[in-house]
Amino acid sequence: MTFTASQLLALLPLLLTTGAMVALMLAIAWKRCDDTAFVVTIAGLNLALFSLPIVMAQGDQGVTPLLQIDGYAVFYMGLVLIGALATCTFGRSWLKGYPDNREEFYLLLLIATAGGLVLAGSRHLASLFIGIEMLTLPMFGLVGYAYRERHSLEASIKYMVLSAAATAFLLFGMALLYAQAGSLSFSDLGLTLATTPAHHPLLMGGLGLMLVGFAFKLSLAPFHLWTPDVYEGAPAPVATFLATVSKIAVFCVLLRFYLAVPAAADPMIHWLLAAMAVISIVIGNLLALLQTNIKRMMGYSSISHFGYLLAVIVASRLGQMPVEAAGVYLLMYLFTSLGAFGVISMMSSPYRGKDADSLHSYRGLFWRRPYLTAVLTVMMLSLAGIPMTLGFIGKFYLIGVTVDAKLWWLSGAIVLGSALGLYYYLRVMVTLYLREPGMQLRDAKGDWAITSGGLVVLLSAALVVALGLYPQPVISLVQGFQNVVLH
């Protein structure tokens, strides 16, 4: 097998991330220094991000039978790298209070990011599985990184056991599809399964088992039970990565698979996805109403947000509009989640025990840190889909797609879920502006705004507001990147 120069250039983000990974391993072996580890990680991720225009200039490139680097892949690679960079900067602040080895945090982060990049360009079940495993396995260590805390170890073990079960379902589903089609390529599966009789046992069984695996990775109901415990137990920067990079990478490969394999649009699978979307929206929002822990609340909130996004897959038989809607919504979800979890990271440190995840810890924050409060307020408004924020544009797109597909009941579920979500997001905002209690509460550092994590949080808030007021740059960006090559 030979590689052309264009194919190698198309792999630049993955090659640069892998190079940073190797350089970091050598640096750790030579001399432990968390400053060096941070610089190597940030440099590698930035180089990978700034290489994306070079990748786009190569056009659509099929790199081996495993990867397709097209506009769709480049867009989601960008989201993965932005999320990883933000996680790295939040981790820098959090690790300053960490008493043990810090360098492995960055190494595990780079490995997981490489897995996300593989998923963004995957067009083969083998690369899909490799990408998911590269993304998932480092998360076991990252979730349990604060291993002196019992809740962190518990979260890591739960995530590991349940993730192993989900991987078994995914692999078994792939095996059944291979037995029926004789190929693992998305395009070959699409061509072969299109001629397979409807409701063939191997076809339905394979697609159903794969759907279970994907549903776990996206924490969709009824496979969501791990989510609140893992979000609560994971360090705040790791929860950021779980909520953004991990889910965005898995969703983008699921959407490509669904578009490439027409058999996945079988009415039975179609209605199963639709039911899962509605259940996720309802359960995610109802359980979030009951939470007094902000990380658990964000965990349940993420269940509902990916329930909304399942509506895109249900409507995706209509053409490119659902693909565009998914891109806009995930861009909004990325920046909004980075801002919200960034504030939690600013308030947390291992020196002070558990993360500042109790809602009570944020009572009266406005009177101590008004600008940090403004950032969290903007993020809550955006997640609720309030006008003049990027969240409103994302929700508008989703409702537009479901209305266009005449899925009125699904549109109603999105509206109902948004109304329920408004209540618990407003509860967080009200808590921020209450008068401070007499007792001393957790607080961010006085110079939080000039730290790398603080700058990321402020930039995220500025983008959420600016792009909510004038969304055309986002729409044009997404439209320019959404060419999906399915062969």
From Swiss-Prot:
<keyword id="KW-1278">Translocase</keyword>
<feature type="transmembrane region" description="Helical">
    <location>
        <begin position="125"/>
        <end position="145"/>
    </location>
</feature>
<dbReference type="InterPro" id="IPR001750">
    <property type="entry name" value="ND/Mrp_TM"/>
</dbReference>
<protein>
    <recommendedName>
        <fullName>NADH-quinone oxidoreductase subunit N</fullName>
        <ecNumber>7.1.1.-</ecNumber>
    </recommendedName>
</protein>
<dbReference type="GO" id="GO:0048038">
    <property type="term" value="F:quinone binding"/>
</dbReference>
<dbReference type="GO" id="GO:0008137">
    <property type="term" value="F:NADH dehydrogenase (ubiquinone) activity"/>
</dbReference>
<feature type="transmembrane region" description="Helical">
    <location>
        <begin position="8"/>
        <end position="28"/>
    </location>
</feature>
<keyword id="KW-0997">Cell inner membrane</keyword>
<feature type="transmembrane region" description="Helical">
    <location>
        <begin position="374"/>
        <end position="394"/>
    </location>
</feature>
<feature type="transmembrane region" description="Helical">
    <location>
        <begin position="303"/>
        <end position="323"/>
    </location>
</feature>
<feature type="transmembrane region" description="Helical">
    <location>
        <begin position="408"/>
        <end position="427"/>
    </location>
</feature>
<feature type="transmembrane region" description="Helical">
    <location>
        <begin position="269"/>
        <end position="289"/>
    </location>
</feature>
<keyword id="KW-0813">Transport</keyword>
<feature type="transmembrane region" description="Helical">
    <location>
        <begin position="71"/>
        <end position="91"/>
    </location>
</feature>
<keyword id="KW-0874">Quinone</keyword>
<dbReference type="GO" id="GO:0042773">
    <property type="term" value="P:ATP synthesis coupled electron transport"/>
</dbReference>
<feature type="transmembrane region" description="Helical">
    <location>
        <begin position="37"/>
        <end position="57"/>
    </location>
</feature>
<keyword id="KW-0812">Transmembrane</keyword>
<keyword id="KW-1003">Cell membrane</keyword>
<keyword id="KW-0472">Membrane</keyword>
<dbReference type="GO" id="GO:0005886">
    <property type="term" value="C:plasma membrane"/>
</dbReference>
<keyword id="KW-0520">NAD</keyword>
<feature type="transmembrane region" description="Helical">
    <location>
        <begin position="449"/>
        <end position="469"/>
    </location>
</feature>
<comment type="similarity">
    <text>Belongs to the complex I subunit 2 family.</text>
</comment>
<feature type="transmembrane region" description="Helical">
    <location>
        <begin position="159"/>
        <end position="179"/>
    </location>
</feature>
<dbReference type="GO" id="GO:0050136">
    <property type="term" value="F:NADH:ubiquinone reductase (non-electrogenic) activity"/>
</dbReference>
<keyword id="KW-1133">Transmembrane helix</keyword>
<feature type="transmembrane region" description="Helical">
    <location>
        <begin position="235"/>
        <end position="255"/>
    </location>
</feature>
<keyword id="KW-0830">Ubiquinone</keyword>
<feature type="transmembrane region" description="Helical">
    <location>
        <begin position="104"/>
        <end position="124"/>
    </location>
</feature>
<comment type="function">
    <text>NDH-1 shuttles electrons from NADH, via FMN and iron-sulfur (Fe-S) centers, to quinones in the respiratory chain. The immediate electron acceptor for the enzyme in this species is believed to be ubiquinone. Couples the redox reaction to proton translocation (for every two electrons transferred, four hydrogen ions are translocated across the cytoplasmic membrane), and thus conserves the redox energy in a proton gradient.</text>
</comment>
<dbReference type="Pfam" id="PF00361">
    <property type="entry name" value="Proton_antipo_M"/>
</dbReference>
<feature type="transmembrane region" description="Helical">
    <location>
        <begin position="203"/>
        <end position="223"/>
    </location>
</feature>
<dbReference type="InterPro" id="IPR010096">
    <property type="entry name" value="NADH-Q_OxRdtase_suN/2"/>
</dbReference>
<feature type="transmembrane region" description="Helical">
    <location>
        <begin position="327"/>
        <end position="347"/>
    </location>
</feature>
<comment type="subunit">
    <text>NDH-1 is composed of 14 different subunits. Subunits NuoA, H, J, K, L, M, N constitute the membrane sector of the complex.</text>
</comment>
